[in-house]
Amino acid sequence: MRWLTVGLLAAIGLLQYPLWVGKGGWLKVWEYDRQLQQQKEVTRKLEIRNAGLDAEVRDLKQGYDAIEERARFELGMVKQDETFVQIPEKVPGK
């Protein structure tokens, strides 16, 4: 009777091994789920960035406000009859 119990427990253990550790087992499923959640987060951040870039491209195509803003801040351009005044920032410790 004791050998039968040991044999059945061993059979159950051998049947459980592929379920938990084998190819396609629960441990792999949990790992794939974790990777999927990480990839979804990366994708969400990239979609937000792409939406911002798309809005900027549409604004550049349709209006001159974005072009003027870029010319002023990135290139330092000023309009005709406009005076440019630059105030230097104070450096801490001086």
Curated annotation (Swiss-Prot):
Keyword Membrane: yes
Regions of this protein lying in the Periplasmic compartment: 22-94
Compartment(s) of residence: Cell inner membrane
Topological region Cytoplasmic: 1-3
Membrane topology: Single-pass type II membrane protein
A Pfam family reported for this protein in Swiss-Prot or TrEMBL: DivIC
Record's keyword terms, sorted: Cell cycle, Cell division, Cell inner membrane, Cell membrane, Coiled coil, Membrane, Transmembrane, Transmembrane helix
GO biological process terms, semicolon-separated: FtsZ-dependent cytokinesis
Coiled coil regions, renumbered to chain: 31-73
Regions that span the bilayer: 4-21
Gene Ontology CC annotations of this record: cell division site; cell septum; plasma membrane
Major subcellular location class: membrane
Family: Belongs to the FtsB family.
Record's subunit section: Part of a complex composed of FtsB, FtsL and FtsQ.
Annotated function: Essential cell division protein. May link together the upstream cell division proteins, which are predominantly cytoplasmic, with the downstream cell division proteins, which are predominantly periplasmic.
PANTHER family membership: CELL DIVISION PROTEIN FTSB
Protein name as annotated: Cell division protein FtsB
The gene coding this protein: ftsB
